[in-house]
Regions:
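Glycine-rich beta-strand-to-loop/alpha-helix junction loops that act as flexible
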Residues: 47-49
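Short beta-strand->loop micro-motif that forms the acidic, two-metal-ion catalytic signature
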Residues: 62-65
């Protein structure tokens, strides 16, 4: 037996969730553009479920910012997190190029995607098995 939706509640909910997802994606894209303006000499990756494509609507964004040299990692992370807009669920890590060889980092970043490659690391990331050929 089919039960009709109560006054289109289901379709309204689905439209609301779709609008909310689009708004989150726009917040994310704007944040990445801001990161690129602030630290153009970097490579920015997305990893985790959003990079693999198996995310759900409430999944956060996992982002790695790679730099050649990091003077004060904690200070930089705090500065970059302050730029994050409210309502954007995001986990941010900052890594140096040397960190990419660490087995734990390699495992975490496997199947990541490059959002911005200001350091020209694409071939090295591919060689390390961190990005997929797309």
């Amino acid at each position: 037996m089919h039960i009709p939706s109560s006054n289109g509640l289901r379709s309204r909910l689905l439209r609301y969730l779709a609008r909310r997802q689009l708004a989150k994606e726009e917040l994310f894209q704007n944040y990445i553009k801001l990161l690129i303006r602030k630290i153009s000499r970097s490579t920015i990756l997305i990893f985790g479920s959003r990079a693999r494509g198996d995310f759900v609507p409430y999944s956060d964004y996992d982002v790695a910012v790679i730099l050649t040299f990091i003077n004060d990692k904690l200070e930089l992370i705090e500065k970059l997190r302050r730029l994050k807009p409210k309502g954007l669920d995001l986990d941010l890590i900052v890594l140096s190029i040397n960190d990419l060889r660490d087995p734990i980092v390699k495992s975490m970043l496997s199947d990541s995607k490059i959002l911005y490659d200001g350091l020209g690391l694409k071939s090295e990331l591919r060689h390390l098995g961190l990005i997929r050929d797309s």
